Design a protein with these regions (language model features):
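Hydrophobic beta-strand scaffold residues
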Residues: 91, 139-140, 192
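Short, ordered loop/turn segments at secondary-structure junctions
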Residues: 45-46, 144, 198
Length: 244
């Protein structure tokens, strides 16, 4: 079903209207399928029940909870079937385990790829990561800030760069999130990926991961859980148009 040989072009971190993305699951699938992606991971937010950002004035903040998770997973799996038939694109479900805190050194997000059961973050990010890993997910430390400035309010998530114990729970680390580089990840020699953290259509461009793995979910999750090397590429408008 693949249109081109070689490593798989992946978006490992993407959001829909189930949390804070602008597109439905179907729209997300069509955009990435038409643009030549081989793998799309749908990873909407789950936040703790007392998350402070829920109550920001004017904030649009939705997230997955234990009640909505079966509906979310069902929609992603239906769209995964259509994506494979229509585009030869693999769609993998997951969640972004989201532990926000006003103190950046306590805040951390982890993308759980291949997760098919609900995981709460009410017990803390470390417990959530352990639970997701035990369920078979690949865990990617998302936008792991070192000393970089925040690109927008509420985005500083520094705990991975400060907490060696938490780092040990992640299989991979975002070296690039969109166009933002987290240099400490490379300096520490950590297994890296690049993702778009897709919320809006213009996030289709930017740094992405090319994965030298078999084109099925089990192989992709297994590869991401390992320290094996990946390729990183920057996707520009011309390449997106050429792939479509």
């Amino acid at each position: 079903m693949r249109r081109t040989p070689g490593p798989l072009l992946c978006e490992l971190h993407a959001h829909t209207r189930w949390s804070d993305g602008e597109l439905t699951v179907a729209e997300l699938v069509d955009l990435h399928g038409r643009s030549g992606f081989d793998v799309l991971c749908v990873t909407d937010h789950v936040v703790r029940s007392d998350d402070a950002w829920r109550y920001e004035e004017g904030a649009r903040f939705s997230s997955i909870d234990e009640t909505s998770f079966p509906l979310y997973l069902g929609e992603v799996e239906r769209e995964a079937d259509r994506a494979w038939r229509t585009y030869g694109m693999l769609v993998v479900p997951g969640l972004e385990l989201t532990f926000n805190d006003e103190e950046p050194v306590l805040a951390a997000h982890a993308v759980a790829i291949g997760l098919r059961e609900f995981v709460s973050v009410d017990g803390g990010i470390a417990e959530a990561m352990r639970t997701a890993a035990e369920a078979g997910a690949a865990l990617v430390a998302a936008h792991p800030n070192g000393n970089e400035p925040a690109t927008r309010r509420g985005r500083l998530t520094k705990r991975f760069s400060r907490d060696a114990g938490l780092r040990e729970l992640a299989h991979r680390f975002e070296l690039f999130n969109r166009a933002q580089l987290f240099g400490w990840v490379a300096e520490a020699g950590l297994p890296a990926v690049a993702s778009g953290d897709f919320h809006h259509a213009h996030h289709l461009r930017g740094w992405k991961t090319l994965l030298p793995a078999r084109h099925d979910e089990e192989a992709i999750v297994d590869y991401l859980r390992s320290p094996r090397p990946v390729y990183i590429t920057r996707l520009e408008d011309e390449l997106v148009r050429a792939a479509a």
